[in-house]
Amino acid sequence: MQVSPAIVKGIAVSSLGLYAGILTSSTVISITTPINVLTQHLKNVLCTLGCWSTVLGGLATGAFGLSYYLAAPGERPNYLLCGLGVAPLSAAYLYLVSLFNHKLAPKCTRDQNDLEKQKDEKLPQHHPEVKDGEAACPFSKMNNAKTLKPESERSVKCHSYMSLHMSIVTGITIFTFGKCILDGFKA
């Protein structure tokens, strides 16, 4: 049974598009939501989005690799290599930034100023009021009675640092997705 390169390219580009969409959603949620709501009420939702983005990123990487392999040696377009590398490179980049942010940077600890800033953060317009220990995300499996481990709570400074890097990766992923679509029409 022979696999059509066009079908594999379609799967690759579709997976990359879904990956870019999930990454964009995660970034928007992270930027617009105060850190205390993220760590207390939306942590499971973001973890689920992370799992799905890993699956879709792996599928896109595999499909782009297979498309590149199936293409004739003289007709291997560059966008296949771009699509092949974007998910693993973005995952590695975010992992290293997160590692630096949470393990190696001693300045990313909570202090009294962070707690005051966090209390002053505004929720998005028309969002119900969230008080510590009362509200929970309807999609979260987390029980309100459970307390978080201290290392899962991050400072406002760390939150803004990670949001910046997530925005960078999201922009690069969306650009690569657009490049794959436009270059795919040329071929």
UniProtKB/Swiss-Prot annotation:
Location(s), subcellular: Membrane
Residues in the signal sequence: none
Membrane-protein topology: Multi-pass membrane protein
A Gene Ontology biological process term: autophagy of mitochondrion
Primary location: membrane
Coiled-coil regions listed: none
Stated family: Belongs to the ATG33 family.
Further comment found in the protein's record: Present with 3210 molecules/cell in log phase SD medium.
Designated name of the protein: Protein SCM4
